[in-house]
């Protein structure tokens, strides 16, 4: 899948911001058909980082949410600032 079609939007909630600061994780709403590998490739291509792991879930609204943990040498805070979350 095209990286720009996989990631729909970032999630900006208290929990998501806490995860950026404490756990080096970014949270996105993604295409429901995207696999964890698709999400990993999309984040790595769009933000020029390395991804350690991806956790996904389907929300009550029927959207797919992805928690993307970055490798320790990359900062989720810097990426969040670059995409305008802070």
UniProtKB/Swiss-Prot annotation:
InterPro entries: Nucleotide-bd_a/b_plait_sf, Ribosomal_uL23, Ribosomal_uL23-like, Ribosomal_uL23/eL15/eS24_sf, Ribosomal_uL23_CS. One of its GO terms (biological process) is translation. GO terms for molecular function: rRNA binding; structural constituent of ribosome. Keywords: Ribonucleoprotein, Ribosomal protein, RNA-binding, rRNA-binding. The keyword Phosphoprotein does not apply. GO terms for cellular component: ribonucleoprotein complex; ribosome. It holds the Pfam family Ribosomal_L23. Belongs to the universal ribosomal protein uL23 family. NCBIfam families: PRK14548.1, uL23_arch. Binds to 23S rRNA. One of the proteins that surrounds the polypeptide exit tunnel on the outside of the ribosome. PANTHER family: 60S RIBOSOMAL PROTEIN L23A. Part of the 50S ribosomal subunit. Contacts protein L29. This is Large ribosomal subunit protein uL23. It comes from Thermococcus onnurineus (strain NA1).
